[in-house]
A protein has these predicted regions:
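Sec-dependent N-terminal signal peptides
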Residues: 3-12
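Preference for short coil/turn "hinge" residues that link or interrupt alpha-helices
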Residues: 5, 25-29, 137-140, 196
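Boundary at the C-terminal end of the N-terminal hydrophobic targeting segment
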Residues: 16-18
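Short structural boundary motif marking the start of a folded domain
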Residues: 21-23
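Secretory pathway targeting signatures of secreted, lumenal, and periplasmic proteins
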Residues: 26-128, 159-169
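Short, well-structured beta-strand
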Residues: 103-111, 115, 124-221
Length: 221
């Protein structure tokens, strides 16, 4: 009976995950697209038609996201919409909603991002990685939708916290692109029993959402 109950619970969880609505992100220049769960939060919302119609002379600094308007899920001491040390220009960035784990303070942020590494002018520089990286591991190469990427595990550390995750580099049509997942954690200490633990199941949920976006990435031209 216990085995049957466990099977049914797992089956329902898998069904629920699969049934989560997906959205499609297409870059403003039509270069790439990917699908992402509508659970994720857009850290870099695209300009709307109304924004585009507003005369440039009437725009003020309030028309652009400020530090105060950044969603909580996208905010961290470290870089979340680019690899730490990558110095890239973020093109897309989606975060897992922080409020889902508000009672688990060790979870700070988790994002999937796409950035252009403008300083990498050729394939060798691009695929060698950024000189300012703290490289945890270099994992070789992989293929995502017929495009080859070199994989690095990169991160950063500070007092009572840190971040890490994979960075995927490719040189496409004369430009260097980096896809990545970064997870930020707090190592602050709490009295036993005062907070809940961020579990393996929690991490599986977060990583699954972000990797779905990563694995659906495709260049359109």
């Amino acid at each position: 009976m216990k085995a049957l109950i466990a099977f049914l619970v797992c089956g329902l969880a898998t069904w629920g995950y699969a049934q989560t609505p997906l959205k499609t992100f297409t870059s403003s220049d039509g270069l790439f697209r990917f699908s992402y769960s509508d659970v994720l939060i857009d850290c870099l919302p695209q300009p709307t038609a109304a924004d585009s119609a507003t005369p440039a002379t009437s725009k003020t600094s309030t028309d652009h996201p400020s530090a105060l308007s950044i969603p909580a899920a996208c905010a961290s001491q470290g870089a979340t919409c680019d690899g730490p040390g990558s110095e890239g220009a973020s093109v897309a960035c989606f975060a897992y909603p922080k409020e889902r784990f508000k009672d688990k303070p060790s979870f700070v942020a988790a994002t999937f991002y796409v950035s252009e590494i403008e300083s990498a002018k050729n394939k060798k520089i691009c695929m060698d990685g950024s000189p300012d990286w703290f490289v945890i591991n270099s994992k070789g190469v992989t293929t995502i939708n017929h495009v080859t990427f070199k994989i690095f595990e990169i991160g950063d550390n500070w007092m009572n916290g840190g971040q890490s995750g994979p960075a995927y580099r490719t040189f496409h049509n004369g430009k260097c692109y980096e896809l990545g997942i970064q997870t930020v954690s707090s190592r602050a200490e709490y009295d036993p029993g005062t907070v809940k633990e961020f579990s393996k199941e929690d991490w599986s949920e977060v990583e699954g959402r972000l990797r779905n976006a990563l694995n659906s990435f495709v260049f359109l031209k």
